[in-house]
């Protein structure tokens, strides 16, 4: 997910995306622990998405952009 795409979303949509990303990360970690995860690059991708979402939320909180 691109940061400009996230910036175009409303606050409620961003919160929903964050919730979905946390759920996806949980499921990926569960698959990793049971050795069912095929693509290991999914974990860092989801973590980066969460970081981008939190960055945009913080920008809005501080009214930077």
Swiss-Prot record:
SUPFAM superfamilies: Ribosomal protein L29 (L29p). One of its GO terms (molecular function) is structural constituent of ribosome. The keyword DNA-binding does not apply. Keywords: Ribonucleoprotein, Ribosomal protein. One of its GO terms (cellular component) is cytosolic large ribosomal subunit. It comes from the Bacteria. GO terms for biological process: translation. InterPro entries: Ribosomal_protein_uL29, Ribosomal_uL29, Ribosomal_uL29_sf. The keyword Cell division does not apply. Pfam families: Ribosomal_L29. PANTHER family: 60S RIBOSOMAL PROTEIN L35/50S RIBOSOMAL PROTEIN L29 (PTHR10916), LARGE RIBOSOMAL SUBUNIT PROTEIN UL29C (PTHR10916:SF0). Belongs to the universal ribosomal protein uL29 family. NCBIfam families: L29. This is Large ribosomal subunit protein uL29. It comes from Dehalococcoides mccartyi (strain ATCC BAA-2266 / KCTC 15142 / 195).
């Amino acid at each position: 997910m691109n940061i400009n795409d996230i910036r175009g979303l409303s606050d409620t949509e961003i919160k929903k995306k964050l919730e979905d990303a946390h759920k996806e990360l949980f499921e990926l970690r569960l698959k990793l622990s049971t050795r069912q995860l095929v693509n290991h690059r999914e974990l860092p991708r989801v973590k980066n998405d969460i970081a981008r979402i939190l960055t945009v939320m913080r920008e809005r909180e501080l009214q930077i952009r």
